[in-house]
Amino acid sequence: VYGAASAGARAMTSSSSPGISLKGEGISYMAGSDLPGVIINVQRGGPGLGGIQPSQSDYWQATRATGHGDFFMPVLAPSTVQEMADCVYRAFDLADEYRTPVMVLADGMLGQMMEPVVLPEPKESLPEKPWATTGHKGKRAHNIVNSLYLTADALEKLNIERFERYEVIRENEQRSEAFMLDDAEIVVVAFGASSRVARSAVVAAREEGIKVGLLRPITLWPFPTKAIEDALSHAKAFLSVEMNMGQMVDDVR
């Protein structure tokens, strides 16, 4: 993936939880080299070998520390099979726009579902990548893709520039879905397959007269803090629903 991305191709890799851990070093190298690429994690139980049941326990890994060093990457969380396809298309666009790895964080429940899917139309043209190592036989200066910087000043400068780009992503790329949220006194926050169960629970609670709504983060990084802040105007409580021991709750707080 690193090599294909360096040459300007759209490239992706996929695995499930422990396999993503093994890819962590390479993902860090891609981030350090400002290389676009897509990583798909269909999560299963852990830590260690864990189990093959669905899980959402890689939230921290995806949003905090997929690999070593100072970097983030956009993380998309689909909740349907259709959205899994849509998120992959979106991930490639984000990767190219911001020159960064992007993760699609699904789970084993979604990974084993069968639902109708309408694939988006293929793009007729892709963004130009003048930085890529495409080989022009002396027609231009050599392009170098690298994550090694031996002077502290050079590394610091690049990290500062990268984090300025992250602030642009935080400002422009927060995505979420609101369901029965306008007057909700209790806001359920759930992503991925958990949000499907939460949505049914919200409908049942409404039938009982309970003012509850669902906020579904679609981007886990950047987390949709603006949507959380908007809900604070009427919410009395937030309930974080996730297939783990409580990882997203840190961001909800």
Give the ranges of each region predicted by the language model.
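Thiamine diphosphate
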Residues: V1-R64, H68, P74-A95, E164-R253
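Short coil/turn connectors at secondary-structure junctions
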Residues: S6-A11, G32-V38, S57, G69-M73, ...
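Structural motif
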Residues: S14-S15, I40, L105, V189, ...
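Short helix/loop capping segments that flank catalytic or ligand/cofactor-binding pockets
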Residues: K23, M113-E115, V197-R199
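Glycine-rich beta-alpha junction loops
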Residues: R44-G46, A106-M113, G192-S194, M245
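Phosphate/diphosphate-binding loops
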Residues: S79-T80, P101, M245-Q247
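Conformationally flexible catalytic loops at phosphate/diphosphate-handling active centers
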Residues: R99-A178
